[in-house]
Swiss-Prot record:
It comes from the Bacteria. NCBIfam families: leuB. Substrate binds at R96, R106, R134, D224. It is an enzyme of class 1 (oxidoreductase). Binds 1 Mg(2+) or Mn(2+) ion per subunit. It is found in: Cytoplasm. SMART domains: Iso_dh. Catalyzes the oxidation of 3-carboxy-2-hydroxy-4-methylpentanoate (3-isopropylmalate) to 3-carboxy-4-methyl-2-oxopentanoate. The product decarboxylates to 4-methyl-2 oxopentanoate. It comes from Saccharophagus degradans (strain 2-40 / ATCC 43961 / DSM 17024). The record marks Y141, K192 as: Important for catalysis. This is 3-isopropylmalate dehydrogenase. NAD(+) binds at residues 76-89, 282-294. Homodimer. Pfam families: Iso_dh.
Length: 357
């Protein structure tokens, strides 16, 4: 039975890195007989140029009908002056919301071959393997009312609403505990329950879920302390679960512990484990078309796609092992290059990973 994957290369370096991920997926498809079928469509700035909107309804329908979606990146200075309602990034927010992608999985793994790339001492980060589980469709980014209003005294006031319903906390919490069961069985829930009522409820719901997972050790941490601990002693964490805004900030902090954002994949899943997979890094318009972008985050996102949406763990393992083997061989893209290594292009890196499979 075939599995349909929609590719959304997007803007900037997106088309280059998605092309390499597709190449690697074709290699595992040939080896494991997965029956992968690919369709390609537009999102972001390139969709605005063609359709006048960052995500056409036809594209959204195609994504909803697929088994999984693999995206490159969206945005660039060309579209920065547009009204905020039709900016490239709105296409990504819409696809997350319309597909019900409430769980964002952000691994922060330090490859031993790249230990020197981290800004922290090797003894602090070596062996780092954190999974941040971020709630993606609720919280202050989606809460209503929101806006900018004119007060009676003539002053303008900006306002947003931080809101979470029990069911939203429940489902992201269960996702985190399920992930922890497959890892080191530790969950740290991050909130600001000493100040925000919405996160008082968050803490209560997470605590009650933990009763269903007695093997998993649960801890709670205020977000300011969590940010400090991520830098001070990151290896204390296994799975971190948190709301939309806190997760947005903490996952980028965790990303830089690894030394290169060009290595980090992500997954966004819905109730049915259908998902959108994308690298953590942006569209990098300054290097687009030069063949120097690191495709490994997108390739590793493809591995996550095989694992979480297509239930093809062996194929996912094969991709991750191939990435490790290529790094062992000393091949490096520009962003992770160091003295004594061999600098390779985007395409050469993709070729090397595919060849290892």
């Amino acid at each position: 039975m075939s599995k349909k994957i929609v590719l959304l290369p997007g803007d900037g370096i997106g088309p280059e890195i998605v092309a390499e991920a597709k190449k690697v997926l074709e290699a595992v498809d040939a080896k494991f007989k997965l029956g992968l079928k690919f369709e390609e469509d537009l999102i972001g700035g390139c969709a605005i140029d063609v359709h006048g909107v960052p995500l056409a309804q036809s594209t959204l329908d195609r994504c909803k009908a697929a088994d999984a979606v693999l995206m490159g990146s969206v945005g660039g200075p060309k579209w920065d002056a547009l009204d905020s309602n039709i900016r490239p990034e709105k296409g990504l927010l819409k696809i997350r919301y319309e597909m019900g992608l409430y769980a964002n999985l952000r691994p922060a793994i330090l490859y031993p071959q790249l230990a020197d790339a981290s800004s922290l001492k090797p003894e602090i980060v070596s062996g780092l393997d954190i999974l941040i589980v971020r709630e993606l469709t609720g919280g202050i980014y989606f809460g209503e009312p929101r806006g900018i209003r004119l007060l009676d005294n003539g002053e303008r006031q900006g306002y947003n609403t931080y809101v979470y319903a029990e069911h939203e906390i429940e489902r992201i919490g269960r996702t985190a505990f399920e992930m922890a069961m497959k890892r080191d069985k530790k969950v740290c829930s991050v909130d600001k329950a000493n100040v925000l009522e919405a996160t008082v409820l968050w803490r209560e719901v997470i605590q009650s879920i933990s009763k269903d997972y007695p093997e998993v050790e649960l801890s709670h941490m205020y977000v300011d302390n969590a940010a400090m601990q991520l830098v001070r002693a990151p290896k204390q964490f296994d799975v971190v679960v948190t709301g939309n805004m806190f997760g947005d900030i903490l996952s980028d902090t965790a990303a830089m512990l690894t030394g290169s954002i060009g290595m980090l994949p992500s997954a966004s899943l819905n109730q049915d484990s259908k998902g959108l997979y994308e690298p953590v890094h942006g569209s990098a318009p300054d290097i687009a078309g030069q063949g120097v972008a690191n495709p490994l985050a997108t390739i590793l996102s493809a591995a996550m796609m095989l694992r979480y949406s297509l239930n093809e763990a062996a194929a996912a393992d094969a991709i991750e092992a191939a990435v490790g083997a290529v790094l062992d061989d000393g091949l490096r893209s520009a962003d992770i290059f160091s003295e004594g290594m061999k600098k390779v292009s985007t395409q050469e890196m993709g070729d090397a990973v595919a060849a290892k499979i």
